[in-house]
Amino acid sequence: AETSVADASRAVAWVFNNIQKFNGDPNEIFVSGHSAGGYLALMTVIDKDWLAKYDIDANSVAGLIPFSGHTITHFTIRKERGIPGEQPIIDKWAPLYYVRGDAPPTLLITGDREKEMLGRYEENAYFYRMMKVNGQKDIKIYEMDGYGHNMTAAGFPLLLNFVKERTKN
């Protein structure tokens, strides 16, 4: 787990440190991913310590857009510990552990709760609620009705609208 989150954080830090070389705007960096990638996007930005290692404030991220990301401790980590995949855990490897009201704008996208894997919609709904309870104002959740875990293509217009609403270009 640590290696994966560290690699994802290093990749985001690289973008911050190099985006201007490619005529990009460091104020318009969005972090996204699907499934395990959504989990890594969440961990990289919600737990501010990961980007702080590179002298980057995680709140500099313009937006966070996980597609069907685990918000509890990832099932691979639970499996490594001998914990069944259906047993939810919230510890330092869970984005839920780090909920905070000052996080970047966030768009949570999941498949249909009846078709999505392992309660992923419910995890994201709880994350959404706890972020709101902690004062997060700019957070939305979308459940892609009729879609399972493979809802990414259907969700891309939501991502594009979210980015467009928060950028100059």
What residues fall within each predicted segment?
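Residues at the starts of beta-strands that form the adenosine-phosphate
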Residues: 28, 105, 138-140
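Primarily recognizes the serine-hydrolase "nucleophile elbow" in alpha/beta-hydrolase
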Residues: 10-80, 90-91
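Solvent-exposed, polar/charged alpha-helical surfaces in well-ordered, non-transmembrane soluble domains
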Residues: 6-13, 42, 97, 125, ...
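Residue-level signal for short, function-critical loop segments
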Residues: 35, 112-114, 147
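The feature captures the conserved acid-bearing segment of alpha/beta-hydrolase catalytic domains
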Residues: 55-77, 86-129, 133
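C-terminal catalytic histidine-bearing segment of alpha/beta-hydrolase fold enzymes
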Residues: 109, 125-128, 132-169
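Glycine-rich, phosphate-binding/catalytic loops in enzymes
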Residues: 47-49, 81-84, 123-128, 160
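Cap/lid segment of the alpha/beta-hydrolase catalytic domain
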Residues: 1-3
